From Swiss-Prot:
Abundant in placenta, moderate in liver and heart, whereas fairly weak in other tissues examined. On term placenta, mainly localized extracellularly surrounding the syncytiotrophoblastic cells and very rarely expressed in the maternal decidua layer. This is Olfactomedin-like protein 3. Residues 1-21 form the signal peptide. GO terms for cellular component: extracellular space; extracellular vesicle. It comes from Homo sapiens (Human). GO terms for biological process: signal transduction. It is found in: Secreted. Glycans are attached at residues 177, 248. Residues 134-401 form the Olfactomedin-like domain. InterPro entries: Olfac-like_dom, Olfactomedin-like_domain. Pfam families: OLF.
């Protein structure tokens, strides 16, 4: 052992005392922290026990209430089923009574109309229409309906092109607008975010009402002539028909409709002044004028030139009419009430004279209380595309020969 060893031992002994003191304080600190944690843990256990007891008490109180609510729900469901059955039975009885006591048809037999000299630009008036196809069907009944979705405002139009080779859906929202939505197929239209996937076609002039028509790749619509704002309940001016090419997005033709003092043809659809329609025979227009403000007029149009080929004064009243469509040369007018009830075809006019009054069926639409802003007939599908307060609906039609008895 060298001479420096005692000095090293003395040095280590001098440091051992303070280190032992520090260890003692550290142990005391750890004991205090553990005691605090144990106290908090005990508090948490007490709170958990108290909360568990409160939850048990709440559950015991709620179980009887839930049993009572379940019994009341079952009672309400039973009552609703009973009421639904009674309503169905009443509707069947009403339908039976209506078939036993049908409303008087408004079909005009063409032996009563007489021909007159033609007027240039207006076409022949009240002459029997010569069918260009062998279409001889009439509506037997409106069999079913399917509500597709709700899109847009209370008034609008949706349709397919009856002559088109695609399944495109055209949607024209509103009564004074200039943009149409085009969907590739019906499935795309029914999607939740359908508007994002639709292409938009903007026309150079805003349309008037819900009388537009897509036919043969063209959009036909009515507009107010420039410089003639019109307005009010009656239009002092006539309307201009526009033929718009949907693919090229250009106006290819236009023509002033040969009728002055136009008024809405439908008493329940005040924004439409000319309602364009298409069937197996071609292009038609439904309108009314102040000259006879009680009844509808029908015109046959040339889809190429927009010329009016023939015109008829129909016996179908404007009052309570809401929409119309044409099938095989026969005009069918749909009537309703305000507030809305079940719509019904209550007037027909066969321009060819084939459908006689006693053979005209006047069916109700399926059980739905609404108001049709527009109806478009598709000859290929034998379906109606309807706009009902923002809902897009498809009606399937059952047909029969015009010569068959009802």
């Amino acid at each position: 052992m060298g001479p420096s060893t005692p000095l090293l031992i003395l040095f280590l002994l001098s440091w051992s005392g303070p280190l032992q003191g520090q260890q003692h304080h550290l142990v005391e600190y750890m004991e205090r922290r553990l005691a605090a944690l144990e106290e908090r843990l005990a508090q948490c256990q007490d709170q958990s026990s108290r909360h568990a007891a409160e939850l048990r008490d709440f559950k015991n109180k709620m179980l009887p209430l839930l049993e009572v609510a379940e019994k009341e729900r079952e009672a309400l469901r039973t009552e609703a089923d009973t009421i639904s059955g009674r309503v169905d039975r009443l509707e069947r009885e009403v339908d039976y009574l209506e078939t036993q006591n049908p409303a008087l048809p408004c079909v005009e037999f063409d032996e009563k109309v007489t021909g007159g000299p033609g007027t240039k630009g207006k076409g022949r008036r009240n002459e029997k229409y010569d069918m260009v196809t062998d279409c001889g069907y009439t509506i037997s009944q409106v069999r079913s309906m399917k509500i597709l979705k709700r899109f847009g405002g209370p008034a609008g139009l949706w349709t397919k092109d009856p002559l088109g080779q695609t399944e495109k859906i055209y949607v024209l929202d509103g009564t004074q607008n200039d943009t149409a939505f085009v969907f590739p197929r019906l499935r795309d239209f029914t999607l939740a975010m359908a508007a994002r996937k639709a292409s938009r076609v903007r026309v150079p002039f805003p349309w008037v009402g819900t009388g537009q028509l897509v036919y043969g790749g063209f959009l036909y619509f009515a507009r107010r002539p420039p410089g003639r704002p019109g307005g009010g309940g009656e239009m002092e001016n006539t309307l201009q028909l526009i033929k718009f090419h949907l693919a090229n997005r250009t106006v290819v033709d236009s023509s002033v409709f040969p009728a002055e003092g136009l008024i809405p043809p439908y008493g329940l659809t005040a924004d439409t002044y000319i309602d364009l329609a298409a069937d197996e025979e071609g292009l038609w227009a439904v309108y009314a004028t102040r000259e006879d403000d009680r009844h509808l007029c029908l015109a046959k149009l040339d889809p190429q030139t927009l010329d009016t080929e023939q015109q008829w004064d129909t016996p179908c009243p404007r009052e309570n009419a809401e929409a119309a469509f044409v099938i095989c040369g026969t005009l069918y007018v749909v009537y309703n009430t305000r507030p809305a009830s079940r719509a019904r075809i209550q007037c027909s006019f066969d321009a060819s004279g084939t459908l006689t009054p006693e053979r005209a069926a006047l069916p109700y639409f399926p059980r739905r209380y609404g108001a049709h802003a527009s109806l478009r007939y598709n000859p290929r599908e034998r379906q109606l595309y309807a706009w009902d307060d923002g809902y897009q609906i498809v009606y399937k039609l059952e047909m029969r020969k015009k010569e068959e008895e009802v």
